[in-house]
Amino acid sequence: MRTTMTMDDGVQFGLGAFETIAVERGKGILLSRHLARLGRSAQFLGLGDLAERGLTMERTAEWIGENCPEHSACKILLTQENLMMRLRPNPYGPARYARGFRMDFSAVRRNETSPLTGHKTLNYGDCILEHRAAAAAGMDERIFLNMRGKLAEGTVGSLFLVSGGRIYTPACEIW
């Protein structure tokens, strides 16, 4: 996998997409869903077809199996001219979930009318700044609301409600 980047619109202006995939025992959790979402974003942003760029389910699963430790995270970053995959430790595990997460609400609002809504793009600066501010305030995460005051997402995490054995998350259509 390449470790240098070409200065394209993704690097210069954030017109790229990414996915972060939890890895357990050498397998990407919900890998097909992550790749499908990345593929939709790639098409929307004009980044091309994933398979034509060599990012198939089989090759991605193989790379994860060969390179990812037991409990880790794999980040795929895609721009017009760049495709990179990297590993990092996954800070989330049973002990962290048992402890729970301290959260508060961000004063920054998500713009539900943005064409980028629903895509994990490289336009992520506000998320990182708000996540750092949350940590400085003793929080683990900060929650974004949309312009109408409805739940949107976390700074670096997804929002889930577990009820009756089912998992729910805010749909783009409602925010």
Where are these regions (language model features)?
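Helix-start/capping segments and mature chain N-termini
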Residues: 1-62, 79-175
